[in-house]
């Protein structure tokens, strides 16, 4: 009674089961017209009544709501009666459709309905749809959409097309319930409909709105904006409802098709450029859009909605979701798909937890990695068994188990007498399992035919035991044939007295009379899959013993079906196993390189080569992705070679590290292995299978001539040539094949490099066995051997470009060196490359090679002509003579290895040899390192390490003795005095060294095959001698340099010589300047044999120490100057000392070094006092310190226009403030405003109360964060204070500022703003700072604010002088602390003042004292308040007192009043 129910929470309540959706929507719309609105209880009663009404016959279409209301009982709960009343009124207002014409009258009775004749067509009645109506006077019920509302509406209309009655009824009901604005309706449209439907609806709505605005709408104001904008106002209820009716009416003009056309499903690919996607959309719209339909809005809508996610993010970020198409294209023109092919992210695996796994109960692994099945959460709901899941319940599985056939045999024990025998199919029916399932569906287990397995490789043959009862049982192989009516057995199974009858047999060869006989004796046949024998009452006998056939008469008793397994083609597995790692395991996107066109000749050759590769099984047809171009190349003999350009695939491939360091050194073959044989493999790379997943990276296309058709696609089945990992993979596979052979023949040696194999054996018999075993292993693995290229001793053995003789090696092709001075760059480069190939056997030093290498340098054009100088031409002569002696010995295992190292100015030459041999084993050359200095100790240690590495790798031995060309004295001196890292290496190998010294040429002339003696290398001799202690009788040389100048000082009890000079303009190097200063200093000290050199350059210090021990000059930009040092230091005794610069120590070394540094400083032009004031506007005292007199400083201040305008008195008034006892004791802070160029700056100022030093920063705000930032900058500038004192502004009393002060251990107090006693110092500092800023901006209006503030702080802190102490604020801020006040101190002769005082903060009216002031300052005095402490007392709490007259002393005539104020 009068109860008001709440609105339903769900936007569309569910209809009762059996009620059509459009009927339920009519009931809902009528319910929502109730005032107040319906409750959930009303809907519950409505559903309950409709369920009852659905069972009555009155439920027809259209519904008679009056008849339905008569079924409603009186007093039915809820408001169902009101809902039916609204429906009855609405139904009466809707005009009824015209009734169909009555059927034509007939005099005859209607005939009986014929079931063959269909009834006449009756047009279905369209469901009635109620219009959207708002009750008069109803309050606005607008509520924005929520996601659950949109989802519920979309679920209701998911099966309806836009504009259909069900769609419109649902939308009307939602609009009536939520009363949406224009923006809400637009959101609903985008959520429900596709971009095409939304675009078409938008066009229709625009046209309807234009018509409505033209004819006028109640409540529409043209001056307030368009209708769509005014409808967004929730208060405009009537105007909003007009917009809702127009929005719903726009659906009536939509096309009837609910499906979008084909061009609406065009989507942008993940890697498709955006402009290409828009171009496809544009073409599709031109071809498929109806005439008259505007294309631009649809194109813009689809260009955003159908783009991929990355382009949609770009468009959203730039606000171009519905912008002009040009803006959208420009926004996405720089977008490229992310390159995911080169990125390999490896995330470390987290350690497993210590807790046990909840599946198996064991620790040490994650539950996701557990192999045990997951336990069920509870008992099975079907059988209540907690050990299995519901999906595994036995009740859900079929009760008939299916027998599993065995692979080897099938043994069925079936009864001999079957009540219902089944006739087998005629015609030799062999049945496979799928056919069997189709023939025998749903049979019980006793009627399933036994499956007889057959071997497809041997035809349907089976072993059977035949017992003819006239002889012993015999086992034969019989052919199973369901096409034979009778069983045929050979006559050999029967005895001679077996009765046989003549018969005629019709078979494939025709009718025969005498080939087969008929026996009537019973025959027993036992089959392997049956325990009970088959009994035949008669059978055919083959008189020629050719056939044994078990026919249909025997198989009929078995009731079996022959099962021939599907012929699975065995996979083609090459003998060599496929490699496990290929280098493409991360599977990047395969390359797509287009095939370039070929001329007819090349195309024909390519097709022939592809045909041969296809026949050989190296390639196969392919239809997948990926492509790399191919082309043929003609060889010198006229044949063609197949080339596959795999550069794109190689760029994606990871290099596999090869286990082979390179080709073996054939000199390591011992002379005892005299019997040799070479094996050459044909098409070696084509024997390694290529896994299927890598075929896209090795695919290619053979084009059609003139592009008459699509090309033919192929892919490699084996590793192709041109793939960068093919040699490494083949080398590993071949090593795996040869490893068992190596183990079987330990006395022999097998050399393998790529596809070349060399067999070495001590005897001919062993070589034959080794050769046969190797050949058999290679052939068994599918590696073809080229017989015509096999070489064997006795005879010449050519292997890897070298000729192997019994005791020596020579190169197959030794280059010929023409002697001429003019060379083309490619010619000389090719010649040096060939010489480098044969350099291991060429008896020459590094010098002629280095001379020709230098000729190749400093050339940038490959077409250059090179002109050799006479020394380089002589190097060609030496090389041609050395190449004529090119030969190497083979290893003699009974002799030790020896080494010889020759250090020269051009590099290092190393020789490995054995005694009493005609030729060395190998020659090794190494250039100098690319450094400015190469100590010979470092070169010798590097050569020893290289020698040991090579001999161990090639011969498996170390050199017993190493000869070098360094004298014993030089070697010992280097070991004793040098701190180079090579010293431990030389000490470790010193027991193997043999110093040749001055007898260098004797051993090396034997190697070089010459009689000319070799000159000793002068660079190995020490240039000068280092003294371990300072030389007292020698002068001292100091030198230094900068990027622009160099200087030196020569001192011997006084300065003998000093000089500074600038560097040449092109060079601005500090190292060059330091070296130049040292050279000039050494030139001035040329006459002294001993010298003390002091350097603050570590570079020069280490360079001179290395030069003293012997070094080679390397490549350096300072090489011309470095070459002068040995001349100036030759035969001198030098003491070297490194000085640390800028130490300010009082010793003479630091003083003279600082004096040398001072020579490098360019004098700065001193500013005149007038210029300084015009720049900084400093005070009079600061000008006097800069050299001006008092009168000149006063005149400068009076003549300054900015000072007269902004500060006529030229000083600030004095204030009174409690000061700190020492720097950074107490600070005061404040924020003052400064307006300049319409910008209000907040100057955060901090002042030290002891020194008056100021720190200021300009900000735009007064927040706590700005205050904290300014305080931190002040601390970085002045130091950390103990106390800070500010006003009680919001920035200073904020919690953030207080927390920051607490974290820095700073005590914060507040004072009264603008109080001269408590805040006078910071206020006066604000005035000084702002006065200077006004002066600067008066002179320079365009001066930046930060620059002006920096100049002002420099002027206040560093230039202006305090009058009371005659120091600047910065000097006072960094002055030493006050001495502690002793308990007893002697009276000084200085005039002192005595004061009565009161302690601040106490209300006592009694004066204390008098006490003598320790220090006086502006505003306060330091008074000892106790025997151990003093305190600053302001003037207002002080009274001057007369000094007590000392005993016996005269009275001070000036002191007349003993009680007066200061």
UniProtKB/Swiss-Prot annotation:
It catalyses: Endonucleolytic cleavage to 5'-phosphomonoester; DNA(n) + a 2'-deoxyribonucleoside 5'-triphosphate = DNA(n+1) + diphosphate. The RT polymerase active site binds 2 magnesium ions. A motif (PPXY motif) lies at residues 118-121. A zinc finger (CCHC-type) spans 355-372, 378-395. Residues 614-804 form the Reverse transcriptase domain. The keyword Translocase does not apply. The active site is at residue 481. This is Gag-Pro-Pol polyprotein. It comes from Human T-cell leukemia virus 1 (isolate Caribbea HS-35 subtype A) (HTLV-1). The gene is gag-pro-pol.
